[in-house]
Curated annotation (Swiss-Prot):
The lineage of its organism: Eukaryota, Fungi, Fungi incertae sedis, Microsporidia, Unikaryonidae. Belongs to the peptidase T1A family. Pfam families: Proteasome (PF00227). It is found in: Cytoplasm; Nucleus. This is Probable proteasome subunit alpha type-7. InterPro entries: Ntn_hydrolases_N, Proteasome_alpha, Proteasome_alpha-type, Proteasome_sua/b. It comes from the Eukaryota. GO terms for cellular component: cytoplasm; nucleus; proteasome core complex, alpha-subunit complex. The 26S proteasome consists of a 20S proteasome core and two 19S regulatory subunits. The 20S proteasome core is composed of 28 subunits that are arranged in four stacked rings, resulting in a barrel-shaped structure. The two end rings are each formed by seven alpha subunits, and the two central rings are each formed by seven beta subunits. The catalytic chamber with the active sites is on the inside of the barrel.
Length: 242
């Protein structure tokens, strides 16, 4: 008997094939990185140059949700747009009810709820998106990774999108816990270029958001002139260079 893979039905092996297909869609998305140390959180997003007429600022990858929450998504553009709006809606209602931004624990619940809804109905398509969420609460930072199944876990560094395999290997070599914001930004830009293959990948720009003690946990986007020196430093790095 062939497996039923057109909806969220279990196969004979106990799997849901649509989850695997959705994850493949997310894995083909633009590369995004999150890193967390005791000093704060850094989010980086790759932004391929789709046209010479492309306006960089028109495509916002990293979104500020509330005062102390930042989100970056990758995967199918329609799904990443929905996820960003859904997270914003959950955070808005939480703040309306409790007069504060959600804790990391509550954000896990909200992220689970958003993604799980699409894995339980036979008439729904699983979301082809992964997210990285930064949360600041009571003097500490959290970085949450959510996959297509809705599984949400805390990480000190995580990567989503097509460069995940190479970048994860590089991140595992680092002592991220003690790194400063500046060091995490520097390393993040470096590994983005290490995972880039000029022979088959488009040129890209980089969007960076930081949340630190200095910003009060508030997510701040770096300006182009702050990113440009790092791009010049690493844009010619070899894909095979260690």
């Amino acid at each position: 008997m062939s497996n039923l893979d057109f909806c969220t039905i279990y196969t004979t092996t106990g799997q849901i094939d649509q989850l695997s297909y959705a994850q493949k869609a997310a894995d083909s998305g633009d590369t995004c990185i999150g890193m967390k140390s005791k000093h704060g959180v850094v989010l980086l997003a790759e932004k391929p140059r789709v046209s010479p007429l492309y306006i960089l600022e028109s495509d916002e990858k990293i979104r500020k949700i509330g005062n102390t929450i930042g989100v970056v998504c990758t995967g199918m553009s329609s799904d990443t747009f929905y996820v960003g709006c859904a997270i914003k809606d959950y955070v808005f209602h939480h703040k309306e009810n409790f007069n504060e931004d959600p804790t990391p624990g509550m954000m896990k619940v909200y992220l689970n709820d958003i993604f799980h809804y699409f894995t339980r109905g036979i008439n729904l398509r699983v979301l082809g998106a992964n997210t990285l969420t930064s949360v600041y609460k009571d003097g500490s930072f959290s970085l949450l990774h959510t996959d297509c199944s809705g599984k949400t876990l805390s990480y000190k560094a995580a990567c989503i999108g097509k460069g995940t395999r190479r970048i994860k290997t590089e991140l595992e070599k680092l002592d991220i816990d003690t790194m400063t914001i500046e060091e995490m930004v520097d390393v993040g830009v470096k590994v983005l270029y290490m995972a880039h293959d000029p022979s088959k990948d488009k040129e890209f720009d980089i969007e960076i958001g930081i949340a630190s003690m200095e910003t009060g946990g508030d997510l701040r986007k770096l300006e182009n002139h702050e990113i440009r020196p790092l791009v010049g430093k690493y844009k010619h790095i070899s894909v095979d260079e260690d």
